[in-house]
């Protein structure tokens, strides 16, 4: 079994040293969803949630979270991401919001934690803004869709 890179041989947590790795262009795409009542979606779409524009706020929260990932996850490297995008899709069933986030960087380590954090915080923001009208919401299926690295 492969040894985890963030643990020492004695099992202590450490930040991985990436200084010898080459700087590469890297991108990650993550996805997740929040299930909610169709009536809640109508309120979101008509901008009738008391706390304000839900999707605009969730988009900004996701982007901000991606930028702060290194402060939130103890062994995650603080990265100067060069691009982050958060988008939303409402499927025909109208019982969920699908959240997709992409992040890009030119660095010595990947940017997947930033994309995953963006999706998660966007979903939590939707939850927070809608919890007064919907007690059934469920955040689920947050996962990495794609991770790429290209030579500069």
Give the location of each predicted region.
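C-terminal binding/interaction regions
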Residues: 1-55, 60-152
């Amino acid at each position: 079994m492969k040894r985890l890179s963030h643990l020492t041989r004695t099992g202590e947590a450490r930040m991985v040293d990436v200084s010898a790795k080459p700087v590469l262009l890297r991108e990650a795409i993550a996805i997740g969803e929040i299930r909610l009542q169709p009536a809640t979606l109508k309120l979101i779409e008509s901008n009738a949630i008391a706390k304000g524009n839900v999707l605009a706020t969730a988009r900004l929260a996701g982007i901000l979270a991606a930028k702060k990932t290194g402060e939130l996850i103890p062994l995650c490297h603080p990265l100067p991401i060069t691009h982050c995008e958060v988008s939303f899709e409402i499927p025909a069933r109208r019982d969920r919001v699908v959240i997709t986030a992409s992040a890009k960087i030119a660095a010595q380590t990947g940017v997947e934690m930033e994309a995953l954090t963006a999706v998660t915080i966007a979903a939590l923001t939707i939850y927070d803004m809608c919890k007064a009208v919907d007690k059934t919401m469920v955040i689920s299926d947050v996962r990495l869709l794609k991770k790429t690295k290209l030579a500069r």
